[in-house]
């Protein structure tokens, strides 16, 4: 199963792909963003995909189907949508690749 998010507006040209080979396999997440300030930026999935407002007021909270606490990618009981940080280079771009079993592309908890 594969899903793609395309970022428009402030993140013009950004994308993120999600690939999961089977319901029990981890999700491979990779992508590219641009026009961000250099340094670390939190990377997470929100409940809704509406990013028309730059302050994320239309996005809802972090994806959290099990009502866990906020945390990092490595915290066992954090929001499913908490995917850690990405590091943006001085030119405002970042590429990222990770694997996680905290999210799924299958079933009722699918992103």
Segments from the language model and where they lie:
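N-terminal leader/targeting pre-sequences
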Residues: 1-111
């Amino acid at each position: 199963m594969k899903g793609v998010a395309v970022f428009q507006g402030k993140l013009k040209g950004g994308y993120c792909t999600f690939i999961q080979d089977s319901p029990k396999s981890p999700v491979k997440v990779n992508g590219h963003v641009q026009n961000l300030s250099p340094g670390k930026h939190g990377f997470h999935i929100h409940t809704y995909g509406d990013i028309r407002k730059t302050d994320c007021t239309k996005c809802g909270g972090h994806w959290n189907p099990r009502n866990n606490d906020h945390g990092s990618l490595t915290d066992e009981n954090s929001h499913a949508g908490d995917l850690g940080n990405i590091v943006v280079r001085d030119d405002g771009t970042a590429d990222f690749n990770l694997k996680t079993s905290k999210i799924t592309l299958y079933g009722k908890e699918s992103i």
